[in-house]
């Protein structure tokens, strides 16, 4: 006999007395205790202690029946002991009306469910449908067909309207595109025409510029040559006027020829001269008054005009400039009128009518302008006649007539003193 381990037995007793495992079968309890390493004697002792010493024979029989497999393999198991008598079966419970009611309702529900299932799912598959059902199905199908047909008709109408709108829009777009193309072509043509006209204008401007430059150069050359000649003449006149004749004896002037006298007469009759009156007096006296023996030399007898009566170079240049500008403007105005007359004669008629009206409105101003032009022409003639006259070297220093005669002749000619005429010219 092996010794019983108290610690293991007490732990097994505590395990068996646990209320949580009280309802579990005894065989499982014994298997669990044996799995913890307890032997058969310790298991029996634990079972006895857990039951408080009662039923030792039953415990022993249970322990022997649930012994481990090792002991069973070595020793044949003993059959369980037969009980002393058989117990009677317990009587059947009595059934109340409630039980019958529950059974009736359950059978009624089950039977109704079976009927519905069979009538709805089984019989339609087994038996053909009735005529009423077929007619109802036909009516439903006809209604669906009519609804679908109406939907198709509305869809076709909407589609046709949409197609018409798209066609109208496409037509409008094509019209706008054609208009845009026409506008673009017109603008391109206008741009080309403008470019060509600009080119022509540039060429015309260049040609006008070249002609103007040439005219200006030619005018400059002519003006410079004329100014040179005028300056030379002025220098000669100043030298003759400023020269002092006191140092030289006065020689008798030779008789003027007929040509010089004619030239001087034409210069006198042509109008107011462009040079001072005092410079033309010696020539006239030379022709009209022959030299006499009574005339003596001296500053009192000489006719020397004052320096203020001689026109300055600035005045002469201004006159020449105004004259060239007037001639140039008149020539350009005539060219412009000819070009306008070729292009648009109505403008020329309007311009001439306007000019006639202006001439009627301002006749006095036109007369003044004509007088000025005549005076300028007379001055030009006088200058040309002076150039044609050849002055003798010392005959111009001959005695001049008395101042009374000079003033009387000048007043009889124009009514204005000679120095005023020289200043005005």
Swiss-Prot record:
Localization: Peroxisome membrane
Swiss-Prot/TrEMBL GO biological process terms: protein import into peroxisome matrix, docking
Protein name: Peroxisomal membrane protein PEX14
Gene3D superfamilies the UniProt entry points to: Winged helix-like DNA-binding domain superfamily/Winged helix DNA-binding domain
Residue stretches of biased makeup (Basic and acidic residues): 315-324, 333-366
InterPro entries registered for this protein in UniProt: PEX14, Pex14_N, WH-like_DNA-bd_sf
Species, as recorded: Komagataella pastoris
Recorded topology in the membrane: Peripheral membrane protein
GO cellular component, one term: peroxisomal importomer complex
Post-translational modification: Phosphorylated on serine or threonine residues.
């Amino acid at each position: 006999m092996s010794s019983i381990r108290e610690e293991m037995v007490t732990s097994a007793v505590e395990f068996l007395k646990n209320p949580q495992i009280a309802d579990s079968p005894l065989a499982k309890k014994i298997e669990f205790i044996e799995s913890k390493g307890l032997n058969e004697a310790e298991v029996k002792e634990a079972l006895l202690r857990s039951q408080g010493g009662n039923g030792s024979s039953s415990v022993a029989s249970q322990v022997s029946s649930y012994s481990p497999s090792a002991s069973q393999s070595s020793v044949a198991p003993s059959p369980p002991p037969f009980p002393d008598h058989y117990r009677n079966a317990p009587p059947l419970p009595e059934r109340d009306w409630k039980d019958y009611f529950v059974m009736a309702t359950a059978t009624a529900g089950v039977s109704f469910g079976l009927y519905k299932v069979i009538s709805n799912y089984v019989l339609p598959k087994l038996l053909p449908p009735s005529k009423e059902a077929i007619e109802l199905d036909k009516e439903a199908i006809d209604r669906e067909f009519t609804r679908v047909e109406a939907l198709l008709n509305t869809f076709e109408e909407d589609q046709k309207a949409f197609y018409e709108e798209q066609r109208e829009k496409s037509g409008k777009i094509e019209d706008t595109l054609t208009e845009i193309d026409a506008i673009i072509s017109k603008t391109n043509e206008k741009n080309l025409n403008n470019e060509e006209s600009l080119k022509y204008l540039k060429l015309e401007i260049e040609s006008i510029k070249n002609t103007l430059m040439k005219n200006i150069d030619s005018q400059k050359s002519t003006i410079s040559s004329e100014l040179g000649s005028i300056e030379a003449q002025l220098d000669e006149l100043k030298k003759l006027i400023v020269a002092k004749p006191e140092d030289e004896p006065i020689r008798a002037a030779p008789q003027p020829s007929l040509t010089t006298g004619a030239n001087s007469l034409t210069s006198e009759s042509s109008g107011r001269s462009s040079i001072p009156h005092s410079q033309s007096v010696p020539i006239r006296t030379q022709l009209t008054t022959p030299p006499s023996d009574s005339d003596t030399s001296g500053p009192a007898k000489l006719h020397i005009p004052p320096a203020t009566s001689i026109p300055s170079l600035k005045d002469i240049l201004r006159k020449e400039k105004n004259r060239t500008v007037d001639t140039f403007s008149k020539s350009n105005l005539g060219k412009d009128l000819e070009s306008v007359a070729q292009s648009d004669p109505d403008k020329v008629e309007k311009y001439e009518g306007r000019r006639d009206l202006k001439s009627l409105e301002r006749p006095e101003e036109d007369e003044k302008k004509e007088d000025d032009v005549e005076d300028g022409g007379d001055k030009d003639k006088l200058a040309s006649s002076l150039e044609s006259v050849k002055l003798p070297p010392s005959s111009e220093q001959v005695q001049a007539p008395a101042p009374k005669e000079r003033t009387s002749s000048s007043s009889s000619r124009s009514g204005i003193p000679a120095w005023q005429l020289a200043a005005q010219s």
